[in-house]
């Protein structure tokens, strides 16, 4: 189950009142990128892609947390009955379905980490998961970035970027370029 576009916009606006910051605009940019790419993919619904992109970081509503925002977003969306969004809140940080590749602080309790790992192990990644992972890697807070520049920025901020995650982001870009028959940057109007 998922919220409508209007409901998703309202959820994000309410979240911004609780914890404003660059993550809100990043979420909007992620959503716009996802919508544009999905329009060119036969098996994806652009409205659904927009909603999933808009709410992928909704766990940030509850404060400044790193891995904790994955837990917070997942449990928040599950509590509202939005299981499809909850799945994206969970998968957007784990291209290769492993918590080991998380970039940032492991600021979760043992119980929260166990829930993340257990839920992640049950997930079958689909093209929506892959699309939001790609768009998350393209979206800055001020606009669309070259994916390699964005990964370098993250590496500079956190001191590392796992090579396998780097490689998987490039594979995602290539996957959607092949699927759409277009250059990703042209699709999302990256200048």
Protein language model annotation of sequence segments:
Residues 22-24:
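A short, charge-rich alpha-helical start-of-domain segment used by transcription regulators
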Residues 5-19:
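Generic N-terminal amphipathic, Lys/Arg-enriched alpha-helix
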């Amino acid at each position: 189950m998922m919220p409508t576009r209007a409901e998703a916009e309202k959820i994000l606006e309410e979240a911004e009142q609780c914890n404003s910051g660059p993550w809100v605009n990043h979420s909007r940019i992620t959503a716009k990128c996802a919508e544009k790419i999905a329009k060119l993919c036969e098996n994806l619904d652009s409205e659904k892609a927009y909603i999933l992109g808009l709410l992928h970081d909704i766990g940030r509503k509850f404060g400044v947390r790193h891995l904790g925002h994955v837990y917070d977003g997942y449990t928040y969306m599950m509590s509202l009955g939005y299981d499809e969004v909850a799945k994206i809140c969970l998968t957007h940080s784990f291209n290769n379905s492993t918590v080991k590749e998380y970039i940032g602080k492991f600021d979760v309790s043992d119980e929260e980490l166990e829930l993340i790992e257990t839920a992640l192990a049950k997930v079958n990644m689909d093209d929506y998961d892959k699309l939001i992972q790609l768009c998350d890697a393209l979206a800055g807070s001020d606009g669309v970035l070259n994916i390699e520049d964005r990964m370098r920025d993250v590496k500079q901020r956190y001191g590392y970027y796992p090579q396998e995650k780097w490689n998987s982001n490039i594979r995602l870009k290539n996957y959607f370029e092949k699927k759409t028959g277009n250059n990703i940057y042209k699709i999302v109007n990256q200048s």
